[in-house]
Curated annotation (Swiss-Prot):
Organism phylogeny: Bacteria, Pseudomonadati, Pseudomonadota, Alphaproteobacteria, Hyphomicrobiales
Catalytic function, reaction form: alpha-D-glucose 1-phosphate = alpha-D-glucose 6-phosphate
Catalytic residues (UniProt): 112
Family: Belongs to the phosphohexose mutase family.
Originating gene: pgm
Name used for this protein in its record: Phosphoglucomutase
Pfam families: PGM1_C_vert_fung, PGM_PMM_I, PGM_PMM_II, PGM_PMM_III
Keywords of the record: Carbohydrate metabolism, Glucose metabolism, Isomerase, Magnesium, Metal-binding, Phosphoprotein
């Protein structure tokens, strides 16, 4: 039976770059999750009798909200819900299920790489029928509705058994609990040369993947160990846990340091990779070589034809604005379209739907293609294994040869986390005021060529997104980018991106922070980061 429950609105349900993210105690407030889910449904139209996909990354509070979402979908008039067994669906797998079964859309429960647990992070994101995150016009409508909502509808049916694959009824709604891995693994087998990768592994090439007690564990075990023949135990931390084992499921050099150290040790594996909370990010490490996400995007694009699913070539490349320009040099050489977008995977969706790009990437360890409409951690890992198998070269050799051909973009990101929001906003406001005066100014050997606050003009729907990050570009291809992140839940995160282009192969072996030292110093001179943040050093350097 459908019940209508009176409620009062919350004023803080504004979705960020990847949905609404808050601490669990916030989501556990009376009607908080229900209000937001109802606001999603109220902002949509035309879903009567249609299919909705629901799944999450297994974090704390995932199961409870899934039950609420199913009952509210029944009350809203959806015809069918597809939900992952155990409430599990990685974000790229959810995107694939939406596309494969022509669903109306999907509710993805995740806070991505943020920690999980009773006092940690939770998130709700709506994905549209193409499998990608809802564009701003929809998230703006959801937010507007959430501020005035006065009731929600929900079925009073019993909870369904999420652990049992099969078909269930909730009032008039059919709920299919599906194997969360099967469709995704089948898609990967279509895109990549599993035979070549299997032979590589059988020949003694040792692969280790750290799933960080998050959602990709079951996917990586099925694909790497069962289908590609990697020894049992090659996938570490393979069981998804509500608190990710007490760890921060963010695949970078801080939170995946154990994996990095293992691959770099003399007797360690040849190849290591890690993925994040919901499976959309990746870190790739070869013996003696950490691959930056910006380089990874460029190298995958340059070698795209080596994978069967991309043998006909790619139509174009897109990258987020803070991502290094390494991919631009590949696009230029191969005669491909190159698009620079704001941070947030949703901006790539239009470009992929319009056939303008095939491969996309972000510096924040996100890479993907038009096979789904989300970034995809395991996809990137398998692409690298396919390239290694096809070229019969080590990761280190592949990267250094790429630099020799295209030049090296020295690149680093400095994160200042949990900065006082007012201080961070003041820093950005003061810097914005300065921008017009910077071009022509010299700082040592660095001369400012241009400075702006990045605005994106979408070539597909003509929409404009302003204030997407401050760029200071120097003559010769170096640049500094500053932006506030929209994915954390405590304070503000100020991100500084520093990049220097080096065409001379004889100068490709410099330690990254040393190669960028003058730019890092100039960034502080121009922006006054230390003065505004009270942090003399970044929290994380990538």
């Amino acid at each position: 039976m459908i019940k209508t429950i009176k409620t009062t609105p919350y004023q803080d349900q504004k979705p960020g770059t990847s949905g609404l993210r808050k601490k669990v105690p916030v989501f556990a407030q009376e009607n908080y999750a229900e209000n937001f889910i109802q606001s999603i449904f109220d902002a949509l139209e035309g879903f009567e009798g249609q299919t909705l996909v629901i799944g999450g990354d297994g974090r704390y509070y995932n199961r409870e909200v899934i039950q609420k979402a199913i009952k509210m979908a029944a009350a809203a008039g959806f015809g069918k819900v597809l939900v992952g067994q155990g409430g599990i669906l990685s974000t790229p797998a959810a995107s694939n299920v939406i596309r494969k079964y022509k669903a109306f859309g999907g509710i993805v429960l995740s806070a991505s790489h943020n920690p999980g647990g009773p006092t940690e992070d939770f998130g709700i994101k709506y994905n549209i029928g193409n499998g990608g995150p809802a564009p701003e016009k929809i998230t703006d409508a959801i937010y507007a509705r959430s501020k005035v909502i006065d009731s929600y509808k929900i079925s009073d049916a019993a909870d369904i058994d999420l652990d049992k694959i099969g078909s269930f009824k909730v009032d008039e709604l059919t709920v299919d609990v599906i194997d969360p891995v099967a469709d995704y693994a089948a898609l990967m087998e279509e895109l990549f040369d599993f035979g070549a990768i299997r032979s590589l592994i059988a020949g003694g090439f040792k692969v280790v993947v750290d799933s960080m007690s998050a959602v990709t564990g079951p996917y990586a075990v099925e694909i790497l160990e069962k289908r590609l023949g990697a020894p049992k135990g090659s996938v570490r931390n393979a069981t998804p846990l509500p608190d990710f084992g007490g760890h921060h499921p963010d695949p970078n050099l801080v939170h995946a340091k154990e994996l990095y150290d293992d691959v770099m040790s003399p007797e360690g594996p040849d190849f290591g990779a890690a993925s994040d909370g919901d499976g959309d990010r990746n870190m790739v490490v070869g013996k003696g070589m950490f691959v930056t996400p910006s380089d990874s995007l460029a190298i995958i694009a340059a070698n795209a034809k080596l994978a069967p699913g991309y043998a006909a070539g790619i139509s174009g490349i897109a990258r987020s604005m803070p991502t290094s320009a390494a991919a631009d040099r590949v696009a230029e050489k191969l005669g491909l379209g190159m698009y620079e977008t704001p941070t947030g995977w949703k901006f790539f969706g239009n470009l992929m739907d319009a056939g303008k790009v095939t491969i996309c990437g972000e510096e924040s360890f996100g890479t993907g293609s038009n096979h789904v409409r989300e970034k995809d951690g395991l996809w990137a890992v398998l692409y690298w294994l396919n390239i290694v198998a096809a070229r019969k070269e080590s990761v280190k050799d592949i990267v250094t040869k790429h630099w020799a051909e295209y030049g090296r973009n020295y690149y680093s990101r400095h994160d200042y986390e949990e900065v006082d929001s007012d201080a961070a906003n003041t820093l950005v406001a003061i810097l914005r005021e300065k921008l017009a005066t910077l071009p022509g100014t010299s700082y040592g050997n660095l001369k400012v060529a241009a400075a702006d606050d990045f605005a994106y003009h979408d070539p597909v729907d003509q929409s404009v997104s302003k204030n997407q990050g401050i760029r200071i570009l120097f003559e010769g291809g170096s640049r500094i980018v500053l932006r506030l992140s929209g994915t954390g839940t405590a304070g503000a995160t100020l991100r500084l991106y520093v990049e220097r282009y080096e065409p001379d192969a004889a100068r490709h072996g410099i330690e990254t922070q040393s190669a960028l030292a003058d730019l890092i110093s100039v960034a502080d001179t121009i922006a006054g980061i230390k003065a505004h943040t009270a942090d003399s050093e970044p929290t994380v350097i990538t």
